């Protein structure tokens, strides 16, 4: 089951959060859902060179809040914040409401080579430049290992190296526990448009396990148990020294 289902959808509410956070009635829900799709499509087309890995959307009353996770925030912000104003105007035009309040927060991705979307974007760019796919995958693995990820899986499918028959090849380094719900799996897909056709790219990045904090209630009047393996404290008897 863990190998078939989307890794992010399986872990929603456990290690993953929703990309859109808002509530709507049954009448307005389709409209707002289409707005989210149009906003993400507009941002990816206009700022594809900025390395945007994710777009988080939140709605509060008539206010729209966006959080952009990017590898190059300077491309979006621009000089003295001019890029933010241009992006805000473009979003208002996309949704067809120039009076909508739009707040934009740009967050820089700390570890670029540990982000699944940015790794998939790097592989896509290399394949479109006609670099051999095995060499591209090996370079992506090396970059991810330097970033300190615990596991990585890369899958590329299509007419690899211009072969007449399409096939799928994948490689894995480290652990990628897809069945473990507490495992933090970053997953992304991309397409590479080559002269021989479209290649599909899938990337799984294992960043560690998220363990919930165990809170045990102690009954009133009971003393907490001593941790196993802990050496008992030794006290010296000095009661007779002053006598």
Swiss-Prot record:
Taxonomy, superkingdom: Bacteria
Gene Ontology molecular function, alphabetical: mRNA binding; rRNA binding; structural constituent of ribosome
Region annotated Disordered, chain positions: 216-243
Alphabetical list of SUPFAM superfamilies matching this protein: Prokaryotic type KH domain (KH-domain type II), Ribosomal protein S3 C-terminal domain
The KH type-2 domain, residue ranges: 39-110
GO biological process, one term: translation
Gene3D superfamilies: 3.30.300.20, Ribosomal protein S3, C-terminal domain (3.30.1140.32)
Any one cellular-component term (Gene Ontology): cytosolic small ribosomal subunit
Transmembrane stretches, start-end: none
This protein's UniProt keywords: Ribonucleoprotein, Ribosomal protein, RNA-binding, rRNA-binding
Basic and acidic residues bias (residue ranges): 233-243
Subunit-level organization: Part of the 30S ribosomal subunit. Forms a tight complex with proteins S10 and S14.
Function recorded in the entry: Binds the lower part of the 30S subunit head. Binds mRNA in the 70S ribosome, positioning it for translation.
NCBIfam families: rpsC_bact (TIGR01009)
Family: Belongs to the universal ribosomal protein uS3 family.
Protein name as it appears in the record: Small ribosomal subunit protein uS3
Species of provenance: Prochlorococcus marinus (strain MIT 9312)
């Amino acid at each position: 089951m863990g190998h078939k289902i989307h890794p992010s959808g399986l872990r929603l509410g456990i290690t993953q959060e929703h990309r859109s956070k808002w509530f709507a009635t049954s009448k307005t829900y389709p409209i707002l859902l289409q707005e989210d799709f149009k906003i993400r499509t507009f941002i990816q087309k206009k700022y594809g060179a900025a390395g945007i890995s994710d777009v988080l959307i939140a709605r509060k009353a008539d206010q729209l809040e966006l959080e952009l996770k990017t590898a190059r925030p300077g491309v979006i912000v621009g000089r003295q914040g001019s890029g933010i104003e241009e992006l805000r105007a473009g979003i208002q035009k996309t949704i067809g409401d120039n009076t909508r309040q739009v707040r934009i927060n740009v967050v820089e991705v700390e570890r670029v080579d540990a982000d699944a979307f940015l790794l998939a974007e790097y592989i896509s760019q290399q394949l479109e430049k006609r670099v051999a796919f095995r060499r591209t995958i090996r370079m992506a693995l090396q970059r991810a290992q330097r970033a300190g990820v615990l596991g990585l899986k890369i899958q590329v499918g299509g007419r690899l190296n211009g072969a007449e028959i399409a096939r799928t090849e994948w490689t894995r380094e480290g652990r990628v526990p897809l069945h473990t719900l507490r495992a933090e799996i970053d997953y992304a897909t991309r397409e590479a448009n080559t002269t021989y056709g479209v290649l599909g790219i899938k990337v799984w990045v294992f960043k560690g396990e998220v363990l919930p904090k165990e809170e045990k209630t102690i009954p009133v009047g009971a003393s907490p148990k001593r941790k196993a393996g802990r050496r008992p404290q030794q006290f010296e008897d000095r009661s007779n020294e002053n006598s």
